[in-house]
């Protein structure tokens, strides 16, 4: 009986009974023997089973738990969670089980025979928004794959692609690049025809390069993906629309708004025309089109498109999904920019969107994630445009701290927030601080050939010299 206890710490009593077929008398016997302890934080319905700390230290931590000893238990959990219809696992029962998977996984010694099991667990943890735990399983699996020199090409590609996706969510772009490049090498060495798969990976790699502010390399990968599609006459509307969309993102980052909008519209038209439209991707198109209109100062159009995207996302995602936060924050930006330029709009319309977006990001992604930094930048701008410069600087500094920690030193987003800090410090006549941040922005912008941004920064540096 005690062999199964390696996986039960913190599990609710009703799950303990369901998955191990233990009845109340069994549980009571274990409690009397001090194998387990029971607590009821919110009454009997929330009763939880925990290993007694002394038993855990003496029996569990000083032995080598075997995956086989708990395999029935683990497989029942996986079977149950795989059957969940939702893309994101969020109900309390499933979350309890995901916690068990994550914690149990730290205790077992895996071999190459368990690669499929580990991959299944990683996917389940991804769906439950447990990104670090999911990535831990994937990296363990990749270590085994590389050590054993597996011939299972499909499994290798699945591991590399999923590890890349999770690393992107964790904002570890260099690791994501490594995983996708390993997938490309695997395909090239396989001697098999993976043309469509290769095009997809090139597109994903381009997205990571864009996130890492490597725009020319990103465009190169998108072009490679499109060339593979054209040469091999691949009919894949989803992939083709993704490439158009991703090129649009590059062009908007380069301030080439006409090309950005043209690519976004092509992506939208393809996504809306297929037999079974993917609402998630259509929402992305609406969101991105709204962003172009925002940059073109067409705020009414921007708000319309961004709200269309939010409406779809709220239908298909749980309330705490980070993509909801992206929509909320962008609508807040729309209202902020509109209020700055048009008296018929009001700044107060923006703040509720910012506050909710920040709350979601801190809860699901953490305080030090790049998306959380975007929330702080947006809130800082909201204060700045209202003349609240100290509050703006406070939020800008939080944003800068995150970006310096997470992103590469010469990232465009670090330059952007450094410029905003210089601008705010100049407003309160703190010339030394203003110049310090503007010089950092200038250095990065020059290295990235951001001509328009560089001109604005150099203009403010001249103002510093005159003050």
Regions found by a protein language model. Give the residues of each.
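A eukaryote-biased feature capturing mid-to-C-terminal, repeat/solenoid-rich segments of large proteins
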Residues: 23, 60-88, 93, 114
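Conserved alpha-helical positions within TPR/SEL1-like repeat arrays
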Residues: 119-126, 154-169, 196-211, 238-253, ...
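C-terminal boundary/linker of central alpha/beta nucleotide-binding cores
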Residues: 1-62, 71, 75
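Helix N-cap/loop-to-helix boundary motif
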Residues: 94, 111-115, 149-157, 191-199, ...
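Residue position in alpha-helical solenoids
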Residues: 103, 107-110, 124, 144-147, ...
């Amino acid at each position: 009986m005690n062999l199964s206890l390696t996986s039960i710490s913190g599990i609710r009593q009703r799950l303990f009974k369901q998955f191990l077929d233990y009845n109340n008398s069994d549980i009571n016997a274990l409690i009397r023997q001090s194998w387990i302890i029971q607590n009821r934080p919110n009454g009997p319905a929330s009763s939880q089973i925990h290993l007694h700390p002394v038993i855990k230290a003496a029996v569990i931590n000083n032995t080598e738990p075997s995956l086989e000893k708990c395999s029935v238990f683990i497989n029942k959990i996986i079977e149950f969670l795989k059957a969940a219809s939702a893309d994101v696992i969020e109900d309390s029962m499933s979350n309890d089980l995901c916690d068990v998977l994550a914690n149990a996984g730290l205790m077992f010694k895996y071999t190459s025979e368990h690669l499929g099991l580990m991959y299944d667990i990683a996917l389940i943890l991804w769906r439950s928004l447990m990104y670090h735990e999911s990535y831990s399983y994937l990296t363990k699996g990749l270590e085994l794959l590389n050590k054993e020199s597996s011939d299972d090409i499909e499994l290798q590609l699945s591991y590399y692609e999923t590890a890349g996706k999770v690393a992107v969510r964790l904002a570890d772009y260099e690791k994501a690049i490594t995983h996708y490049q390993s997938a490309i090498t695997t395909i090239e060495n396989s001697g098999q025809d993976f043309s469509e798969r290769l095009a997809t990976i090139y597109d994903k790699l381009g997205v990571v390069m864009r996130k890492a502010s490597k725009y020319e390399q990103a465009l190169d990968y998108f072009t490679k993906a499109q060339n593979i599609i054209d040469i091999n006459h691949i009919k894949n509307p989803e992939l083709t629309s993704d490439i158009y969309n991703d090129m649009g993102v590059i062009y908007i980052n380069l301030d080439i708004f006409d090309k950005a909008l043209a690519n976004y519209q092509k992506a939208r038209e393809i996504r809306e025309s297929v037999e079974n439209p993917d609402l998630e991707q259509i929402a992305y198109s609406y969101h991105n089109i709204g962003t172009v209109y925002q940059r073109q100062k067409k705020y009414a159009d921007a708000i319309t498109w961004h709200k269309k995207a939010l409406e779809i996302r709220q239908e298909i995602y749980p309330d705490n999904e980070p993509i909801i936060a992206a929509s909320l924050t962008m609508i807040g930006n729309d209202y902020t920019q509109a209020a700055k330029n048009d008296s018929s709009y009001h700044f107060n319309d923006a703040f509720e969107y910012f506050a909710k977006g920040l709350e979601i990001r801190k809860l699901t992604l953490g305080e030090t994630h790049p998306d959380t930094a975007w929330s702080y930048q947006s809130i800082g701008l909201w204060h700045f445009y209202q003349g609240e410069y100290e509050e703006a600087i406070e939020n800008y500094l939080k944003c800068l701290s995150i970006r310096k920690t997470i992103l590469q030193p010469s990232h465009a987003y670090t330059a952007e927030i450094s410029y905003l800090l210089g601008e705010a410090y100049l407003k309160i006549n703190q010339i030394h601080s203003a110049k310090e941040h503007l010089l950092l922005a200038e250095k990065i912008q020059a290295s990235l050939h951001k001509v328009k941004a560089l001109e604005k920064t150099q203009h403010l540096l001249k103002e510093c010299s005159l003050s």
